[in-house]
């Protein structure tokens, strides 16, 4: 049976290639998820301190590990409800917290010398909007996917990339000096995504 693009995306193929040698060892998917939590926590800490390069590199690593735990679970047959929830909570929580951390880090820089001419307090609001919007979108997406087939997602990918691969940009863009622009974009895109997914859910319920 064919599976959707997300299973065959480049990043998931890379994840399977990297962790296939560990099959049969004591490594479990939950170990990988725990490492992903640690990397994401460290990334948020560096973003909060204003170290965008260190934070960005750690975030890219955590995003890759987020693909690896699920692929390793499928390869080894070690999938579990606890592991699924462990991974899901990390996805939703960290995808929101990272923008709040970026907002705090940029606000400190703004207080010291200004960033794009926007005061530090406003950056806190922008970070809150981005983090809250992305968090809500993640929760609504998970609700929307309940009852869908295992290979179906709220948003589909294209050209060898799945929608979740946008998470890599959260690390790459700050490394290139674009954290303020990323945050502004997320403060618009996050709430907008939540509205779009919420509308999908509303249509589903009205159709029932």
Put a short name on every predicted segment.
Residues 24, 74-75, 104-108:
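Transmembrane helix-loop junction
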